[in-house]
Amino acid sequence: MQNVASWLLALVVAVVQGELLPGKSAPALLWSYKLSEGIQEYQLAYNMTTVLPAPEFNAIALELLDHCNSHAYVFVNQPGLRLEDFDYEDAWTVLPNYLSRSSSALRFEQVEVSPSNVFENLIAHTKRRCDVQREIILRAEQTNQFEPYIDAQSRIIQVHFSPLPGDGRNERPSREDVLADHDQRLRRILGRLPSPAVTVIYTSLEPADRLSASPPRAGIFPEIFEHESRRIEYERNDRDLQVNRYFPSHHPKMEPIEEVELSLLDPKFIQSNLKLLKLIAVSAIGSLTWQLYSLFSPKLPVATPKGTAKRQKGQKKLVKLATAQAAKQAEEVKLEVSQQEKED
């Protein structure tokens, strides 16, 4: 609040001393994609019916740049720009879009234009404060030939558009057409930057006299700057929020089976599975019958390996005995035959 109080005091002193020259002012827009805390106070304290002194504008711009929260610092000079040019609503399609998406944005309808190039001081300060080593300068037709870059080094970009034509009806192209063309060129420049994190100062270093000496009745883009959300500061572009990770929805290859409670007493179930039920019943009855027969039938001796060996040994003895008896009987028969032959 001390900064705002000192700024208001300097503004009053400048008005009293008559240091603000009527007609030598230009509108100015300042915005940053990331939040620059403390900047919004100047917007709330500003009165658009007064002219903002050049030193105060310079101090506000320096405070905005001191945050060093951007990958590119763009200084746009539109020679001949005046407050009434923002009444051409059809000419401005890009600038309002960038302003509405920015976390910090300021508008000053009337800023005293310093005799010296205010950009020089701001650019030198940015290079030193934010350690920016590279600078790109685009003049007039070069603004339509901006080549994109893909490295991560911060840059200062100066954009100097060609002066705006007069207000005559016979002017070709018209003032509105030139504003619309420059608006699209700015879109191509900002759209080709590798990061949306930019800080932009848009004004005129060569102002034109206002069409009316009366104080402005409407501010620049009131639908943006007079929105209730602009009364508080918050980060509008925080991409590191706790966002739920994406999981694809489940798409089964087969349709889910309907949940149907089956019952043995269901007539449809019995009719469609009659053969299977009969087979189950026959198997169950047969198994029960076998169990009952095994339970009540006389028990037979169970053969063991040892009993089997004894039985085999006894069988061998019987075979040998039978063989011996047969041999003995054969010998006896042989003796009887031989005796009969002798008697004959």
UniProtKB/Swiss-Prot annotation:
UniProt topological domain (Lumenal) ranges: 19-275
Annotated GO CC locations: endoplasmic reticulum membrane
Residue positions the entry lists as glycosylated: 47
Subcellular location: Endoplasmic reticulum membrane
Keyword Hydrolase: no
Protein topology in the membrane: Single-pass type I membrane protein
TM region(s), chain numbering: 276-296
Entry keywords, A to Z: Cell wall biogenesis/degradation, Endoplasmic reticulum, Glycoprotein, Membrane, Signal, Transmembrane, Transmembrane helix
InterPro entries according to UniProt: Big1
Signal peptide positions on this chain: 1-18
Chief location: endoplasmic reticulum
Positions in the Cytoplasmic compartment: 297-344
GO biological process: (1->6)-beta-D-glucan biosynthetic process; cell wall organization; vacuolar proton-transporting V-type ATPase complex assembly
Family: Belongs to the BIG1 family.
Known function: Required for normal beta-1,6-glucan synthesis.
Protein name according to UniProt: Protein BIG1
Species whose genome carries this gene: Eremothecium gossypii (strain ATCC 10895 / CBS 109.51 / FGSC 9923 / NRRL Y-1056)
